[in-house]
Swiss-Prot record:
Gene that encodes the chain: supv3l1
CDD domains xrefs: DEXQc_Suv3, SF2_C_suv3
Lineage, top ranks: Eukaryota, Metazoa, Chordata, Craniata, Vertebrata
Stated name of the protein: ATP-dependent RNA helicase SUPV3L1, mitochondrial
Residues the entry annotates as binding ATP: G205, P206, T207, N208, S209, G210, K211, T212
SUPFAM superfamilies in UniProt: P-loop containing nucleoside triphosphate hydrolases
Cellular localization per UniProt: Nucleus; Mitochondrion matrix; Mitochondrion matrix, Mitochondrion nucleoid
GO MF annotations in UniProt: 3'-5' RNA helicase activity; ATP binding; ATP hydrolysis activity; DNA binding; DNA helicase activity; double-stranded RNA binding; RNA helicase activity
GO BP terms, alphabetized: DNA recombination; liver development; mitochondrial mRNA catabolic process; mitochondrial mRNA surveillance; mitochondrial ncRNA surveillance; mitochondrial RNA 3'-end processing; mitochondrial RNA surveillance; mitochondrion organization
Length: 763
């Protein structure tokens, strides 16, 4: 929507920013405050619009020159017959003089050739002229005249530009490409939503404040509705809750479709993952959960699409209060007002004044939060040594396994009273946690160059995790938050004491239609190159950013050599796979290759690829492999809903996936036994760590950074399972040494053969 439209809307007296009260709701703004807030929002909006009109400089390094089509034919020798053969040495001098002329460079710049493109075009043109046996008659005659002193060197320019446009076809259509990649008004992409006046209701509050409860209550009351959540687990929860309440509801995720009606007739209510929601189906009520993820660098585009595009009379968004101002600002561009409901936490949580410091101090209802699998393995093992049972939850586990572990932890009759988890517990699972214990406050990540970085968790992340302590519907009405290490506690208090950074922009992503239009103009470009050029040419409003497309490009480059049509290639590249898993990537490549042969990917074919049937895991590496196989089966199911004819056996795949999930659950239930089974043979590794948790986070942090940098340099020479686990990053040297020491002690106590721990040889 244009700024003029905003001015018109603001001039209408009924436009206002309303803050309504609800059960446990907070403040109500006065009229003067509302007008001031509206005026401030409009000032910011006008500034963003005025600053977004100019396009960014074109990154010409993305333009890859195409090979020149030679047009030698019977007419090729006409030029030589009319004049005389060209002297190559003289011709080279003429071409070099042409290249050095500032006037030609300026003229080429006006035609879209910057210094980089001008140089590349000239090198190609010079090679073409010097190596062709016979040139076109007109070019041959012009060059001959210049060599003889009868022509001007500038006469070469039209032929040079003709050649430049052959190797850089985008020069002829750059204006069209800019129009296609203009992302400044994404609201206009959804005409169905713009055709109605929608009511936007923002339910703002922290974790466990009841904000989603009130939105879902309205969803269940409506004649039709759609729930859009960030996780399959959340979509499943709403699907089950809705049907249990007597409201027929279908489930739609990337890998699954469940229709309540036995004949497959769609229900009035749908629970879906955010990427799968329909922006053309009309609804009475739509719920968008975790709206703060609109700023997510990779998935933010899905929340933007849902917020701008859902065709519903009421849009209920749930999320952090830090997103209220931005969502209000964004909705001004569509002429829709925002009604804000502020919620307070139903059960309080407090920050402890003491760190746990030792696993001996654990109590029932404790959840230790780690940010790496290695820490989960280590702590799980140490908890078992103390005679306690623990549940384990981390991101790469299948949803069924996560639910089983959550159920085990929540069951008051189960002896398992401790949970060890990653930040995967931040959303999607209902857990009866009394105390959240941060094992660390730093998280490892990869930057754009693929290098490991260590960052302290943000206030938003810390609050999301800490908010899981104490729950209104659980036995623990009050929650507590602390750290494992004493040095971390003041840092945690500082993090939780800071205000959450307000959201500034929303994510966008190029659509398949936009990429197809690009490909029409640039038929020889690869998909990865098309995406790069699109992002380079794209223009966005100050309210938006283009999401990270590195994963998309990674998959595009992986299957570039496989012959696929553009639409199929695009769909394959949007598949949600973990590129860090080699087995998953290899399977993805096999899927694409089989698809390109127009051969259906049958159940038997898939079983051969994954070596089905698979046994329960005997060690950690087996467990990791089973998780990867589960991801491959998920990939098959995801593709089966996009290419039904080519992936025909989804029901059979789903059956073996359930069996695989059970095997993974067996492995997770016995995770400490799998750790003990890592290697029964001693290795030349120095035993220098104890079974107690180190007190100093500073030394721990330094040690982890050094391990990540030097891990490959210090691998044991022995080609054992332990060395392979170390090489794959599934196990640290310190953890291996510690485990070997513990196994030796246990075997000595049982009067078994002792394990001799050797010392690492000094270099």
């Amino acid at each position: 929507m244009s700024v003029n439209r905003c001015i018109y809307l603001l001039s209408r007296s009924h436009i206002r920013y309303r803050v309504c009260a609800s059960t446990n709701l907070s403040t109500v703004s006065t009229l003067s405050t509302t007008q001031h807030s509206t005026r401030r929002t409009f000032d910011k909006l006008s500034t963003r619009h005025s600053s977004s009109g100019s396009s960014r400089p074109l990154d010409t390094s993305l333009f890859i020159p195409l090979p020149v089509k030679t047009d030698e034919d019977a007419e090729g020798s006409v030029g030589a017959e009319l004049t005389k053969p060209l002297d190559k040495n003289e011709l080279l001098k003429v071409l070099n003089r042409f290249y050095k002329r500032k006037e030609m460079q300026k003229l080429a710049s006006d035609q879209g050739l910057d210094a980089r493109l001008f140089h590349q075009a000239f090198v190609s043109f010079r090679k073409y002229v010097l190596e062709m046996n016979s040139l076109n008659a007109d070019l041959h005659i012009i060059l001959n005249d210049i060599c003889c002193g009868a022509g001007h060197i500038d006469d070469i320019f039209p032929y040079f530009m003709r050649h430049a446009k052959q190797i850089f076809p985008m020069l002829d259509c750059i204006d069209d490409l800019r129009k296609i990649s203009d992302l400044r008004v994404p609201a206009n992409w959804y005409p169905e939503a713009r055709a109605i006046q929608r009511k936007i209701v923002f339910h703002a509050g922290p974790t466990n404040s009841g904000k989603t409860y009130h939105a879902i209550k309205r969803y269940l009351e409506a004649k039709s509705g759609v729930y859009c959540g960030p996780l399959k687990l959340l979509a499943h929860e709403i699907y089950e809750k809705s049907n249990a309440a007597g409201v027929p509801c279908d489930l739609v995720t990337g890998e699954e479709r469940i229709f309540v009606d036995p004949e497959g007739k769609p229900s009035g209510h749908i629970a879906s993952t955010i990427e799968m929601c329909s922006v053309t189906t009309p609804y009475e009520v739509a719920v968008i959960d975790e709206i703060q993820m609109i700023k997510d660098p990779a998935r933010g585009w899905a929340w933007t699409r849902a917020l701008l595009g859902l065709c519903a009379e009421e849009i209920h968004v749930c999320g952090e209060a830090a997103a209220v101002d931005f969502i209000t600002e964004l909705m001004f561009t569509t002429g829709e007002e925002v009604e804000v409901h502020n919620y307070k936490r139903l059960t309080p949580f407090s920050i402890s004044n003491h760190a746990v410091e030792s696993l001996d101090n654990l109590k029932p209802g404790d959840c230790i939060v780690c940010f790496s699998k290695n820490d989960i393995y280590s702590i799980s093992r140490q908890i078992e040594i103390r005679g306690l049972e623990c549940a384990v939850i981390y991101g790469s586990l299948p949803p069924g396994t996560k639910l089983a572990q959550a159920k085990k932890f929540n069951d008051p009759d189960d002896p398992c009273k401790i949970l060890v988890a990653t930040d995967a517990i931040g959303m999607g699972l209902n857990l009866s946690i009394r105390r959240i214990i941060f094992n660390s406050l730093v998280k490892h990540s990869l930057n754009e160059k693929g290098e490991k970085e260590v960052d302290t968790i943000s206030t938003s992340q810390a609050l999301q995790i800490a908010g899981r302590a104490g729950r209104f519907s659980s036995v623990f009405k009050e929650g507590e938050v602390t750290t494992m290490h004493r040095d971390d506690l003041p840092v945690l208090k500082e993090i939780l004491g800071k205000p959450v950074d307000p959201i500034a922009t929303a994510g966008l992503h190029p659509t398949a239609e936009q990429i197809e239009m690009f490909a029409y103009h640039l038929p020889q470009a690869t998909l990865s190159n098309l995406i790069d050029i699109f992002v380079s040419l794209s223009q966005v409003d100050g309210l938006y950013f283009v999401c990270n497309i590195d994963d998309f490009k990674f998959l595009a480059d992986m299957i570039q050599h496989i012959p696929l049509n553009l639409r199929s290639r695009y769909v394959f590249c949007t598949a949600p796979i973990n590129k860090k898993q080699p087995f998953v990537c290899t399977s993805f490549l096999k899927f694409a290759r089989q698809f390109s042969r127009d051969e259906p990917l049958t159940f038997n074919w898939v079983c051969r690829q994954v070596n089905w049937p698979l046994s329960p895991p005997k060690n950690i590496k087996d467990l990791v492999h089973l998780e990867a196989v589960h991801d491959v089966l998920d990939l098959y199911l995801w593709l089966s809903y996009r290419f039904m004819d080519m992936f025909p056996d989804s029901n059979q795949i789903r059956e073996i996936q359930k069996e695989l999930d059970e095997n993974i659950q067996i492995g997770v239930r016995n995770i400490t036994r799998l750790i003990r089974a890592i290697d029964s043979q001693p290795t030349d590794t120095e035993s220098n760590s104890s079974s107690t948790v180190p007190e100093s986070e500073t030394s721990q942090r330094k040690g982890r950074v050094l391990r990540s940098q030097n891990q490959r340099k210090e691998l044991p020479r022995k080609s054992s399972l332990s060395s392979r686990l170390l090489r794959d990053g599934l196990l640290t040297k310190e953890l291996l040494s510690q485990l070997q020491k513990e196994w030796a002690r246990e075997q000595n106590e049982d009067n078994s053969i002792p394990v001799n721990n050797g010392k690492r040889k000094k270099k």
